[in-house]
Amino acid sequence: MRTLILLIQFFTRIPLPIQINMDEINLKKGSALLPFVGVIIGAWNWLIFTLVSLVMPLPVAIIAGLFAEIIITGGFHVDALADTADGLFSSRKRERMLEIMKDSRVGANGVIAICFYFLFYGALFLSVPDTQQIGWLFFVLPIVAKGVTMLLFAKMTYAGSKEGLGSIFLGVPWWPIVIAQVIVLVALGAFFSYIGVIAYAGVILFTIIYRAFVYKRIGGMNGDTLGAGGQMGQLICLFCLVLLWGLI
């Protein structure tokens, strides 16, 4: 339980007035619980979307659901997406890319990435053929994001500084990663049947390609690229689901 509380404190803005000594918790093994942080985020997203959809049109409810995640996480991973875009697409050397990612200012690539991300995300939600599924998508997709993050932990080489937040998860063993994937697949299968499981295959393929691209650019992962990977992973999952619903 203490591990889950620490993960909630780490990945969300939920005010839990509980002091936990990180030295007493093995976050590498406890990272298997990371998808349950996604469950909490997803439940909040679902609640806000559902409440707003009762009194407002669907597009407004979708925007509210997207904004709900920013509220509960503090935009933690959206900021990581912007930093990753600024760094990786800066056409600079590795060391300079890492410096750009640390810069608190958002550059042109970061702004473009965030705008495209939310526009594409919103368009995909509006493209879901069965609007009754949208609420469940808001619930499940954050779980998928944490599953992608867990995949990126596998045999991770850390490119950032040793003091970076992502370095905490350096050396995560295989079994928490496998458990996390099982949790994600169960969630997708429970809500979206076999189509959800097939969609996650597309997410895994994206994760492999994304990981290879990042390693080629900066030689490993850091906190920003890990967070960005999770955000893009849930977007890719929604894309695959909409695509499969249109084909099947």
From Swiss-Prot:
Family affiliation: Belongs to the CobS family.
Protein name: Adenosylcobinamide-GDP ribazoletransferase
Cofactor(s) demanded: Mg(2+)
Annotated transmembrane regions: 24-44, 70-90, 106-126, 134-154, 168-188, 189-209, 228-248
Topology term for the membrane: Multi-pass membrane protein
InterPro entries to which the protein is assigned, alphabetical: CobS (IPR003805)
Organism: Listeria monocytogenes serotype 4a (strain HCC23)
MF terms in GO: adenosylcobinamide-GDP ribazoletransferase activity; cobalamin 5'-phosphate synthase activity
Pathway: Cofactor biosynthesis; adenosylcobalamin biosynthesis; adenosylcobalamin from cob(II)yrinate a,c-diamide: step 7/7
The organism's taxonomic lineage, starting at the top: Bacteria, Bacillati, Bacillota, Bacilli, Bacillales
Physiological role: Joins adenosylcobinamide-GDP and alpha-ribazole to generate adenosylcobalamin (Ado-cobalamin). Also synthesizes adenosylcobalamin 5'-phosphate from adenosylcobinamide-GDP and alpha-ribazole 5'-phosphate.
Record field: catalytic activity: alpha-ribazole + adenosylcob(III)inamide-GDP = adenosylcob(III)alamin + GMP + H(+); alpha-ribazole 5'-phosphate + adenosylcob(III)inamide-GDP = adenosylcob(III)alamin 5'-phosphate + GMP + H(+)
Record's GO cellular component terms: plasma membrane
Gene name of the record: cobS
HAMAP family: CobS
Subcellular location: Cell membrane
GO biological process entries: cobalamin biosynthetic process
Enzyme nomenclature, EC number: 2.7.8.26
Highest taxon in the source lineage: Bacteria
Pfam families named in the record: CobS
